[in-house]
Design a protein with these regions (language model features):
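Short coil/loop residues immediately preceding or within conserved phosphate-binding loops
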Residues: 2
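Hydrophobic anchor at the beta1->P-loop junction of P-loop NTPases
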Residues: 5-7
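Walker A (P-loop) phosphate-binding loop of P-loop NTPases
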Residues: 12
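Conserved lysine of the Walker
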Residues: 15
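Conserved substrate/cofactor phosphate-moiety recognition/catalytic segment
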Residues: 19-65
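Conserved nucleotide-binding/hydrolysis micro-motifs of P-loop NTPases
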Residues: 40-42, 83-86, 105-110
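Glycine-rich phosphate-binding loop used to anchor ATP phosphates in small-molecule kinases
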Residues: 44, 52-100, 119-124
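Small-molecule kinase domains that catalyze NTP-dependent phosphoryl transfer to phosphate-bearing small molecules
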Residues: 105-108, 112-137
Length: 137
């Protein structure tokens, strides 16, 4: 039975690292899975600089619907994305079978201190200048 693991959290908290470890563990158990990384998919979609709420919802819905399409074919999906938007969390819970939401959190000062990509020096950052809507459960 396929599942959708939605790995979410602010930029730089370790979502991709966690998702890669999860994928490796699933592979060891012979569970076929695919990893959808938000940064990689955003680049493919040419949405690198689109951070208005409407654009973030649009991109996150693409991730959600892609996860649904793949999981409906019996493949476990791991989505690593910021997507801290209640509307997306709600849609996922209502529309994705076997949906597991994983929130990765770290103290903001620790994130900024370890910010190798200098993301937190930019003007538009979810959780800093853009409101983050953390999952409720």
């Amino acid at each position: 039975m396929s599942k959708v693991y939605w790995v979410t959290g602010m930029s730089g908290v370790g979502k991709t690292t966690f998702a890669n470890i999860l994928k490796k563990k699933l592979n060891e158990r012979k569970i076929v899975s695919i990893l959808i990384d938000g940064d990689e998919l955003r680049e493919i979609l040419k949405k690198e600089n689109s951070y208005s709420k409407e654009e973030r919802i649009e991109v996150a819905m693409i991730y959600s619907k892609l996860a649904k399409l793949i999981s409906n074919q019996g493949i476990t999906v791991i989505v690593s994305t910021i997507s801290l938007i209640k509307e997306i969390h709600s849609w996922n819970k209502q529309n994705l079978k076997n949906y597991i939401e994983i929130l990765i959190k770290r103290d903001i000062s620790e994130i900024i201190k370890n910010d190798e990509r200098n993301i937190y020096k930019e003007s538009e950052v979810v959780g800093v200048s853009i409101d983050a809507e953390f999952p409720e459960n």
